[in-house]
Amino acid sequence: MKKTSDYAVAVIGLGSMGFGAAASCINAGLTTYGVDINPQALEKLRQAGAAQADTRIDAFADKLDAVVLLVVNATQVNGILFGEPQVAAKLKPGTVVMVSSTISAQDAKNIEQRLAEHQLVMLDAPVSGGAAKAAAGDMTVMASGSDLAFEKLKPVLDAVAGKVYRIGEEIGLGATVKIIHQLLAGVHIAAGAEAMALAARADIPLDIMYDVVTNAAGNSWMFENRMRHVVDGDYTPKSAVDIFVKDLGLVTDTAKSLHFPLPLASTAFNMFTAASNAGFGKEDDSAVIKIFNGITLPEKKEAP
């Protein structure tokens, strides 16, 4: 195994999770590169100590031991690897590609097959934990792939993860575990929004309702994290409504392929879809509460 400073990794996709993962790689002493179309994110990563940050991987592709993809969906993963940027064709044979986007199991398998044509190794490795845990190097990784892929990515996994779950060798297992996790995450947000909407309708102050739930048995991590945004009237997106339209769509597609009923997930999917259709798709996912009529929600307090 190389010394950490000799190990080079590029993180593609410097959103809240990707930026945190890249910063954690820098903090762990890895030679870290960043790729994104956002110039502010690139400059911020340079300031954090990246070896280089650019809109394309061309200048440093041949230096890399690993690539981490933290983009929105399978379309973006395929476009980056095999589309116009042709990232896969520019990497050295044997480079390991960690695909951490939330995608279907079939998409993961298809991507792995195409990477193998370029003699590249894939780890199917979705992540969870949010921006704060990404920045702290404490994400949860649910991964499947070969022993070789895990071995090649050990410096990266050590840098970005608090927990790494090895689901098995078959590509697609990691993707499926993440999809099932997203079922719970989406249902928790939708249920939390419904409860807070009922409280608003009943003229219960939402800050009091929030305080009661977060100190009682009905609490969940998603309620505590997302319903705080409702109380604050701040729908600046940490994760957008449209992300859960996508993720719960993957949940329902997975269930359909298995002929398996998901009544709660289907309802949550419809709630997020309604919120997106009403114009809230780019807002924080807690904005799903805005589908309820006849209630008054807190407004964001402007800083003095």
UniProtKB/Swiss-Prot annotation:
Keywords carried by this UniProt record: Carbohydrate metabolism, NAD, NADP, Oxidoreductase
UniProt: NAD(+) binding residues: 7-35, 102, 246
Catalyzed chemical reaction(s): L-threonate + NAD(+) = 2-dehydro-L-erythronate + NADH + H(+)
Top enzyme category: oxidoreductase
EC number: 1.1.1.411
Domain of life of the organism encoding this protein: Bacteria
NCBIfam families: ThreonDh (NF043037)
Protein name from the UniProt record: L-threonate dehydrogenase
Organism: Pectobacterium atrosepticum (strain SCRI 1043 / ATCC BAA-672) (Erwinia carotovora subsp. atroseptica)
